[in-house]
Amino acid sequence: MYAVIRTGGKQYRVAPESILKVEKLEAEAGSTITFTDVLMVGGEGTLTVGAPLVAGATVTATVVAQDRLPKVIIFKKRRRQNSRRKNGHRQPVTVLRINAINAA
């Protein structure tokens, strides 16, 4: 069984026991999160597509860790101006383990 959920402005295809990195959620490691924005549920020859959400469907996940992605370097240079700027950014993410998909 699999589902498509929406969180952090993005859509993710999830399956039970899969590990997923999503945009930072305010939750501590070890806590359980329930996603109600389920866009699609499928598996074993059946497919339910929501319009826009599947009514009553939920996905539960456990927070594994709060992490950060590798650094992205931003470098801006203006030629012949002796002007340059270097900056770095590490995006915070939440690592989740999908526990169960409940289709209504």
From Swiss-Prot:
Entries under SUPFAM superfamilies matching the protein: L21p-like (SSF141091)
One GO term describing the cellular component: ribosome
Keyword annotations from UniProtKB, A to Z: Ribonucleoprotein, Ribosomal protein, RNA-binding, rRNA-binding
Membrane-spanning residues: none
GO biological process: translation
Entry annotated with the keyword tRNA processing: no
One protein family per Pfam: Ribosomal_L21p
GO molecular function term, any single one: rRNA binding
Top-rank taxon, per record: Bacteria
Function: This protein binds to 23S rRNA in the presence of protein L20.
Quaternary structure and interacting proteins, as annotated: Part of the 50S ribosomal subunit. Contacts protein L20.
Membership in a protein family: Belongs to the bacterial ribosomal protein bL21 family.
Protein name per UniProt: Large ribosomal subunit protein bL21
Gene field: rplU
